[in-house]
Curated annotation (Swiss-Prot):
The keyword RNA-binding applies. Keywords: Ribonucleoprotein, Ribosomal protein, RNA-binding, rRNA-binding. One of its GO terms (cellular component) is small ribosomal subunit. InterPro entries: Ribosomal_Su5_D2-typ_SF (IPR020568), Ribosomal_uS5 (IPR000851), Ribosomal_uS5_arc (IPR047866), Ribosomal_uS5_C (IPR005324), Ribosomal_uS5_euk/arc (IPR005711), Ribosomal_uS5_N (IPR013810), Ribosomal_uS5_N_CS (IPR018192), Ribsml_uS5_D2-typ_fold_subgr (IPR014721). Residues 49-112 form the S5 DRBM domain. PANTHER family: MITOCHONDRIAL RIBOSOMAL PROTEIN S5 (PTHR48277:SF1). Pfam families: Ribosomal_S5, Ribosomal_S5_C. Part of the 30S ribosomal subunit. Contacts protein S4. It comes from Methanospirillum hungatei JF-1 (strain ATCC 27890 / DSM 864 / NBRC 100397 / JF-1). This is Small ribosomal subunit protein uS5. Belongs to the universal ribosomal protein uS5 family.
Amino acid sequence: MAFDKSEWVPLTGLGRMVQAGEIKSIDEILSSGKPIKEPEIVDAFLPDLVDEVLDINMVQRMTDSGRRVKFRAVVVVGNRDGYIGFGQGKDAQVGDAIKKAIVSAKINLVKVRRGCGSWECGCSNPHSIPMLVTGDAGSVRVTLRPAPQGIGLVTGDIGKKVLELAGIRDVWAQTQGQTRTTINYAKATFNALKATNMIRLGGME
């Protein structure tokens, strides 16, 4: 269902500024460093955002009243054009865990700096990343290298899903650690993409 800004009642100052039209783009918020605490802020600027459930796990915990079971969902959101978010959520119901993970991913949204950093290509189109970047999560380390146009996403299935939603079409990836742990693999890939904002260069988006 399409987001209707007129029905939204903002709970934060930033949300009220967005609804009043004082903020014109999501980039304005991300570049300011202000934390996004309402997913509706992202919905207002990126209506084409899609979500992908990467993993659902059962988590058990012993309490005084006995064993409690919850589900943990891992989700990425993106618009396939330079924006990506990663989140996780826990709840006794699978559907509610997914909803919480989507909210978490939206409020953790980042802009990915794209470009053509491959010396084999040099086309200046934003099909890859501008430079080598690395991301860590738990025991997993993911290193992304710029690749020439047409190479595709040379990485595992989880990494591909994250990169595709970010709008990256060509990249070489190297992984270390327990990549079978979906949450760490996805988060490390997300953190590597997040690192593209650390350096500003020309010829990229």
